[in-house]
Amino acid sequence: VYNDKLYGLQIWHNSPEYVMVYNKTLFEENGWEIPSTYAELKDLCAKIAEQGITPWFMPGADGWQHQLAFFQIGGVYEEATPGLYDALNTNQATFADNEKMLEVLNEFKELSDAGYFGEDWIGTDSTNLTNEFGDRNIAMAMANSSYIQQIKDDTGTEDEFGMFLIPLGDNTWYPTNPAGPTMFGYKGTEHEDLVKEFFNFVTTTESLQEILDNSPAYTNVDMNDDAIEQHWLPEEEEFLATVDDSKKSVSVLQTGTKYTNDYWMQFGQDMVAFCQGEMEANDV
C-alpha cells in the first residue's frame, strides 16, 4: 500500500533469513561460545576444526548461497558509511574501494584459505546439508530459521540448534528483508472487482491460517491480524530476543540497493575467483 492505494499483496513471513544456524548441543558439550566479532569467529573455527568437524559449511557449488555471507550484513556497510545505500542507488558510490566491504571479502577468503568452509567447499552443494548437521559433521551453516525443524525431521537428531548473526566485519545487524512473493492485479483487467474480492478472500483470518498451517517453511505470517495462531519456533524467539530493534532498521544489501540482485550470480563467481587467487578483492 502506498498513498492509500493497493499496488500489490504480499503474504510472507517475518522469520530470520540466512543467519548462522549452529548445533547448540555440540557447542555446549565443547564449551564453545557464540562469536560476536570476526576475531571470535576465526578463533572458534580453529577450535572446531581441531575436532575434525567442518566449522562453517559453505555450499559453493549451489552457486548462489555463499554470496549471502556478504549481502546479508548490509547494515554493517551502511553503519560504516552512513548514506551508502542512497549513494549506491544514485551511482555516487561503488562497492570498489569500500573499506568495510573489502574487509569482509578478505575475512571470507581468510576462512576459505584456512579450510574452515570445508574441503572443496567450492565444489560442494547443499543437497546433504541436513544430514551433515544431523551426523555432526558440521557445526554451523547459513540457513533460514525454519531449517532447524527440517534438520530434526530429516535426521531424527536429538541435538538442539540455535542462531546468531553473521559476524563478518564485526556485524551486529539483523538481516531485515521486507521483500517476498507478491500478487498483483492487472491494471487493464475487465474484472477489477474479482481481483479485489480474491485479495479480500486470501487475507481473511481463515485463509491466512490455512496458508500458514500448510506451509512447512513458514512458522508465521507477517500480517496485521492478531487472530492468526502463529507457530514461532522457540529457537526463533530466543534468537530474536537477542537483537535490538535498532539493529533491524537497515535492509539487506540485495533489497536496499537497486542492482545487486541482477549481478548475484556474477558476484558469486567473482568471490570464488578471489578465493582461488584469480582476482583481487577490489575487482569482485
Positions of the model-derived regions?
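Short helices/loops that flank or line small-molecule/ion binding pockets
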Residues: 26-27, 46-51, 127-137, 141, ...
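C-terminal capping/gating helix-and-loop segments adjacent to ligand/active sites or protein-protein/ligand interfaces
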Residues: 176-177, 219-223, 237-284
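Short helix-initiation/N-cap motifs at beta->coil->alpha
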Residues: 38-43, 120-134
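Hinge/lid segment of periplasmic solute-binding proteins
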Residues: 1-19, 33, 42, 48, ...
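Glycine-centered hinge/linker elements that transmit conformational signals in sensory
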Residues: 45-47, 90-121
